[in-house]
A protein has these predicted regions:
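Eukaryotic helix-grip
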Residues: 2-296
Length: 296
């Protein structure tokens, strides 16, 4: 199966993540938070390596097929290519089967905000047998747009929709920190209070400002005897990462509230050097695969 075939097929899962912020704020906040989260996940021989971070257009780092969402086409933005050096961040049964050095995941992203396509592969070991495609669109609504990615036919009928509530969804005990809890953390700079812990998600109907991250995820994993198990594991991990990351984005708002995109590009250059040092030092940090990711 080619990448183009996968983009047009598969069994998609759509996550809708409502946030109490402006779409413009999230543009800066997402990038700031990715840089911070990369530092939190890097150490002890594992973590993030940034290979490329530069603009793309219709002649350089051209995405194929074209970037399209919400009835629009996107032709310019920022291209990144990262390598994730993993071991403890994958399930135990994969570590037993995979040879040393095979647990390196490549992530290529075309960020044409408010749209972004991310492609995750394992070219050295799985080759064309692993693709994770994430297509993200960021809209100024509360998750009410029914089909923002323009799915049709079988894709639309087979789609699973997951609404992630950053205030009330259960967070794994090992992931929880009070400073990453949007029900406890306010933003004095933006003048925003903590979110209510109402169990119903009613806050999403009243939040001002409000926006939604619409994430369409497709997984292709071809490994005899493990396909369904690994595809399920990957989707569970993605939901866990979406929940944790977006709670952090909201709680970190004061850190990036006054920043510009020029500030972000300078920060990314500094973080790249820090990651290169940090990856070879200390202990493994951040998210570690758990048995529950396999069971859910």
């Amino acid at each position: 199966m080619t990448l183009h075939d996968l983009l047009l097929s598969g069994h998609p899962t759509t996550s809708r993540i409502v946030l109490p912020m402006l779409v413009e704020e999230y543009h800066v906040g997402q990038l700031w938070s990715v840089a911070q989260a990369s530092k939190n996940e890097t150490g002890g021989g594992e973590g993030v390596e940034v290979l490329v971070n530069e603009p793309f257009d219709e002649t350089h780092h051209v995405p194929m097929p074209k970037l399209q969402a919400a009835g629009k086409e996107f032709t310019v933005g920022q291209y990144t290519h990262k390598v994730y050096h993993l071991s403890s961040k994958v399930p135990g049964f994969v570590r037993l089967l995979a040879p040393k050095g095979s647990l390196e995941i490549h992530e290529m992203a075309w960020n044409a905000y408010p749209y972004c396509r991310t492609i995750i592969t394992n070219p050295d070991y799985m080759k064309d047998n692993l693709y994770i495609i994430i297509e993200s669109y960021h809209a100024p609504d509360n998750g009410c747009t029914p089909n923002i990615h323009g799915l049709q036919g079988r894709d639309l009928s087979a789609r699973q929709v997951v609404k992630i509530d950053i205030a009330n969804d259960k967070v794994a005990a090992k992931d929880y920190k009070p400073e990453w809890d949007p029900c406890l953390v306010a933003s004095p700079k933006a003048g925003r209070n903590p979110l209510p812990r109402d169990k119903t998600g009613e806050w999403m109907n009243h939040a001002k400002p409000v926006m939604c991250c619409y994430k369409l995820v497709k997984v292709w994993f071809k490994w005899f005897g493990l396909q369904k198990r690994m595809e399920s594991f990957i989707l569970n991990v993605e939901q866990r990462l979406f929940l944790n990351f977006h709670r952090q984005v909201v709680c970190w708002l004061d850190n990036y509230y006054d920043m510009t995109m020029d500030d972000i590009r300078r920060l990314e250059a500094e973080v790249k050097e820090e990651l290169d040092r940090q990856r070879t030092e200390g202990q493994v940090r951040g998210t570690v695969a758990t048995d529950k990711d396999e069971e859910q």
